[in-house]
């Protein structure tokens, strides 16, 4: 025998079915970052007003070894389930929502919520990711099902506002009730 010699098993093991059989469990165990939850306004909002709540999630990629093979996985956010903390939920929905400029806070959005009572509410989001994988640089294959990844809850304080009308003219009577120079006799 002269030259290089290749040694291989006459019946090499096909690892793709074995990788496919365990890929969904491995996908669930990846360190996928859940969506970041943001509320506007925050950490306080008003009862009866629209509170814009939105998710920020991105595609995440991982290179792992499964059964001795190089596997590239990608996790893509596809749906969100919003838990507003007052017994109300939205979703699953593909709507991630998004930030509003401060001068538009209070506007209704696809993911906003109106709180009907005051108090502290634990707001959270469950993000569903769809995955694909490629073995040893091969084609991307879908991972069956989705992975569910919860965001840590954030406490949102819902306050009430009181509006009062005053008849005093603060330029004439700077110490009048409701004027900057007024002091509450009860304090």
Task: Locate the predicted segments by residue.
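Extracellular/lumenal mature domains of secreted and surface-exposed proteins
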Residues: 1-187
């Amino acid at each position: 025998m002269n030259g290089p010699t290749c040694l291989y098993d006459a019946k090499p093991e096909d690892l793709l079915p074995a990788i496919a059989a365990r890929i969904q469990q491995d996908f669930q165990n990846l360190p996928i970052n859940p969506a970041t939850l943001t509320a506007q306004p925050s950490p306080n909002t008003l009862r009866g007003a629209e509170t814009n709540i939105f998710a920020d999630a991105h595609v995440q990629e991982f290179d792992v070894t499964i059964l001795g093979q190089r596997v590239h996985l990608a996790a893509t956010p596809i749906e969100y389930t919003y838990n507003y903390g007052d017994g109300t939920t939205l979703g699953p929905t593909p709507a991630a929502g998004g930030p509003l400029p401060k001068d538009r806070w209070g506007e209704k959005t696809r993911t906003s919520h109106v709180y009907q009572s005051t108090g502290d509410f634990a707001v959270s989001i469950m993000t569903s990711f769809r995955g694909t994988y490629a073995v040893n640089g091969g084609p991307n294959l879908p991972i069956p099902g989705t992975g569910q990844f919860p965001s840590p809850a954030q406490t949102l304080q819902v306050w009430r506002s009181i509006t009062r009308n005053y008849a005093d003219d603060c330029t004439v009577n700077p110490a009048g009730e409701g004027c900057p120079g007024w002091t509450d006799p009860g304090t």
